[in-house]
């Protein structure tokens, strides 16, 4: 029987894992190894994918992938809780004492003050970025869904100016399945950090230690940060830290990154092992006398180490790490070592003998060896807690939020509530108040400059240029802050991962995976981090498709445009029109995705293998940090890009080609420039040169559209009513919804897609699609009498 046939609420034992290539290795790395007990928790509302529980955590799989896993021993779910044992408390060793773990000193000690570099490495969603913030005092955004960190970030460890730590993307192993795993592995091999800080989720220690074992094989000074120990204790669990140190051969420091507990001790141990070059005390986790093929694995790995030792030394790759990767069939490592034909044949012969003796293939044998060691260690050192409050709370919440009949209505209700509160109640109200305040300040400055008798041209620059341009954009700050507040709550709570789970089957119909939904949701805030978040997708096809679709998710920078026009033309229906624009972007994106799926991006989307974290109450600090960062970014942009754009626009609309002050802006330099683009927009119903000019400046930053119009209208926004009817204003909004992203987003596209040509095509593609859709809206409107 295969895993996809297992009934909800039943347990079974994995017999074998089918499939091939990197995906199968990823399944094994995630703990889906023969002999592992799994529980079928639920199916997604549309019947696919499914949620499994194994090794104390939840994992999602598609039915097609689950069909490749053979199971047996089906029975009802075991609800018996772990028996609580009493473990004697042993004081944790101080820095330099080494306690009962034994390190190997290489002798390459550094003097105090010499530079130290660390890699901060751990599974996804284990608190890694929170720890990075505690170590460095930085304010990186923290979320409760897999893949928040999509790029490496460097920071200086507090009170240690000589020590730099790099926050690397969350990974599950050092196998080259995802881009993050390759980035992390390359960092360790090429950058050669002086030390590793491996953060482990203590509430899910069994799966987390799988990566730890591979990091130890890198033979780099290392400490293990046992995070979330406060939750383990609160739920009646225990981890015997000293015994764990003895088993792993590295310092283990219990911490709570969220509560800033144990951070000082962690820093001291990390600095010590790095400075004195104290490498892990053991690299060999094979059981030389083990049963079920364990001894064969031991002999095979040691034989491979002997075979490749010189090649590994020349390639500057740790021999033990290289050997295990070769046994797994890692082609990248094989290529880097440069073995000759005879050596490759010898290698394959060794592995073939091991496979025959183990009765397992190479990948399953290595994964089984690691997990058997982990199970043995956990049996000796860990008393598992009873079901945590967070997990019990998550199970109850998921009955509604991922329920068969309630998931989609709940998602629609949540998003509708967010948009209504942002655009119709809280955000809009605060924006109106701020606008009144800015008008008061502008009026006061105008009267003060008039009383002072300032030169009229300079007076115009300050009031009609700077105050009008920057002030008009700043007035929309509350809307953006409120939107990011709600998006941050979705991220921190863990709901983002559930959305991906619920939407996977639907997204598959348009050629994408449920994992693509997270970057697209982030795109409602800003396209730049959304495009970067596609790095969490293991498939190049899915990654590129998601990048191309992300600009259709209306970013927050367009909100000032929407707010300005809805206030002027649809004051009673502001929220409704804005929500309609967002859904229009989604619909056009879906249609474009179907086109891509059947043309340039044919094929199947990436498998949906993702951990579902427990729901957590959003951290006030994390939410506040994100809001502050976004508000600061918006204000900075207002006083840099928008400030400069306002001055340039004022200059171009004040002077003619001979630099004479014009009486009518129709004679200005700006009218000349805008006149070239205006004919393109005549079929759309807004061919005035001022409108085309504003759209052109929107390429630098979408907020510039509002500041440009404000400057061109001399602050009198009632001029809009002479250029637009409510219907033509709607057509204009549709165009701005879909046309080219800002220059920062285009730069991100270039970086992620790898070529300037791709970025240029995105600009052209978005502008063409925007024009076609806006024209279609206008034609349909005219046919029905608008």
Residue ranges and their predicted role:
Residues 92-173:
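Conserved G1/Walker A P-loop phosphate-binding module
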Residues 276, 283-455, 659-661, 665-670:
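Extended helical scaffolds that flank P-loop GTPase cores
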Residues 160, 185-252, 561:
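Conserved C-terminal guanine-recognition region of P-loop GTPase G domains, centered on the G4
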Residues 440-444, 497-527, 602-626, 670-672:
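Juxtamembrane inter-helical linkers in multi-pass membrane proteins
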Residues 232-285:
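Canonical P-loop GTPase G-domain recognition
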Residues 367, 396-444, 449, 456, ...:
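Hydrophobic alpha-helical transmembrane segments
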Residues 522, 534-542, 550-614, 722-786:
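Juxtamembrane and boundary regions of transmembrane helices in multi-pass small-molecule transporters
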Residues 357, 364-365, 384, 425-466, ...:
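Extended, low-charge hydrophobic alpha-helical regions
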């Amino acid at each position: 029987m295969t895993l996809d046939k297992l009934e909800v609420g039943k347990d079974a034992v994995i017999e074998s894992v089918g499939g091939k290539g990197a995906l199968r290795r990823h399944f094994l790395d995630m703990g889906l190894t023969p002999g592992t007990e799994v529980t079928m928790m639920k199916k997604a509302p549309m019947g696919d994918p499914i949620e499994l529980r194994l090794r104390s955590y939840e994992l999602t799989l598609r039915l097609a992938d689950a069909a490749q896993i053979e199971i047996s021993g089906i029975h009802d779910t075991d609800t018996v809780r772990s028996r609580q044992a009493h473990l004697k408390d042993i004081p944790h060793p101080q820095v330099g004492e080494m306690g009962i773990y034994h390190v190997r000193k290489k002798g390459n000690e550094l003097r105090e003050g010499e530079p130290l570099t660390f890699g901060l490495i751990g599974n996804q969603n284990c608190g890694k970025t929170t720890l990075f913030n505690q170590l460095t005092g930085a304010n990186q955004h923290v979320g409760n869904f897999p893949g928040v960190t999509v790029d490496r970030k460097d920071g200086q460890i507090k009170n240690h100016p000589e020590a730099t730590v790099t926050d690397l993307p969350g990974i599950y192993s050092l196998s080259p399945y995802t881009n993050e795993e390759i980035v992390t592995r390359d960092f360790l091999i090429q950058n050669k950090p002086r030390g590793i800080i491996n953060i482990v989720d203590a509430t899910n220690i069994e799966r987390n230690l799988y990566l730890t074992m591979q990091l130890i094989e890198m033979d780099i000074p290392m400490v293990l940060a046992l995070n979330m120990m406060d939750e383990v204790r609160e739920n009646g669990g225990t981890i015997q830290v000293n015994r764990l140190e003895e088993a792993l051969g590295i310092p283990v420091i219990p911490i709570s990154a969220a509560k800033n507990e144990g951070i000082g001790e962690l820093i001291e141990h990390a600095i010590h092992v790095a400075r004195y070059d104290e490498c892990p005390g053991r690299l060999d986790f094979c059981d030389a006398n083990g049963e079920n093929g364990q001894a064969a694995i031991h002999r095979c790995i040691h034989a491979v180490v002997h075979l490749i030792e010189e090649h590994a030394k020349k390639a500057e790759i740790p021999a033990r790490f290289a050997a295990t990767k070769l046994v797994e069939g890692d082609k990248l490592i094989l290529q880097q070592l440069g073995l000759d034909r005879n050596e490759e044949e010898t290698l394959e012969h060794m592995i073939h003998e091991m496979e025959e003796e183990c009765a397992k293939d190479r990948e399953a044998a290595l994964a089984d060896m690691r997990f058997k060691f982990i199970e043995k260690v956990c049996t000796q050192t860990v008393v598992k807690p009873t079901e945590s409050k967070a997990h019990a709370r998550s199970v109850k919440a998921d009955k509604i939020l991922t329920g068969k009949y309630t998931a989609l209505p709940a998602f629609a209700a949540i998003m509708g509530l967010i948009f209504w509160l942002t655009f119709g109640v809280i955000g809009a109200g605060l924006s109106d108040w701020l606008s009144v305040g800015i008008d008061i300040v502008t009026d006061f400055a105008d009267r003060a400059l008039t009383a002072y008798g300032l030169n009229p041209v300079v007076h115009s620059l300050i009031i009609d240029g700077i105050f009008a341009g920057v002030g008009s954009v700043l007035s929309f700050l509350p809307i953006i802050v409120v939107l990011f507040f709600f998006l941050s709550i979705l991220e921190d709570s863990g709901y983002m991962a559930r959305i991906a789970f619920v939407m996977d089957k639907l997204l598959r119909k348009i050629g994408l995976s449920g994992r693509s939904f997270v970057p697209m949701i982030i795109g409602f805030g800003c396209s730049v981090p959304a495009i970067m978040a596609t790095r969490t997708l293991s498939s190049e096809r899915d990654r590129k498709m998601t990048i191309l679709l992300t600009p259709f998710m209306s970013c927050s920078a367009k909100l000032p445009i929407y707010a300005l026009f809805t206030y002027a033309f649809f004051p009673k229906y502001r929220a409704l029109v804005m929500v309609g624009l967002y859904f229009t972007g989604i619909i056009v994106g879906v249609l474009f995705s179907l086109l891509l799926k059947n043309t340039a991006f044919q094929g199947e989307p990436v498998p949906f293998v993702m951990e579902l974290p427990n729901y957590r109450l959003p951290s006030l600090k994390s939410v506040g940090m994100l809001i502050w960062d976004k508000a600061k970014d918006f204000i900075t942009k207002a006083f840099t890009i928008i400030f400069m754009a306002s001055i340039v626009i004022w200059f171009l609309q004040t002077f003619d080609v001979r630099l004479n002050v014009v009486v009518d802006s129709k004679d200005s330099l700006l009218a000349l420039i805008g006149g070239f683009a205006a004919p393109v927009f005549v079929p759309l119903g807004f061919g005035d040169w001022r409108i085309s000019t504003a759209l052109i400046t929107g390429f630098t930053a979408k907020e510039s559209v509002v500041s440009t119009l404000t400057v061109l209208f001399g602050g009198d926004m009632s001029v809009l009513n002479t250029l637009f009817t409510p219907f033509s204003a709607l057509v204009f909004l549709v165009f701005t919804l879909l046309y080219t992203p800002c220059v920062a987003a285009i730069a991100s596209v270039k970086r992620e897609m790898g070529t300037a040509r791709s970025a240029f095509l995105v600009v052209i593609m978005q502008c063409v699609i925007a024009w076609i859709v806006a024209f279609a809206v206008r034609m349909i409107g005219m046919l029905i009498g608008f």
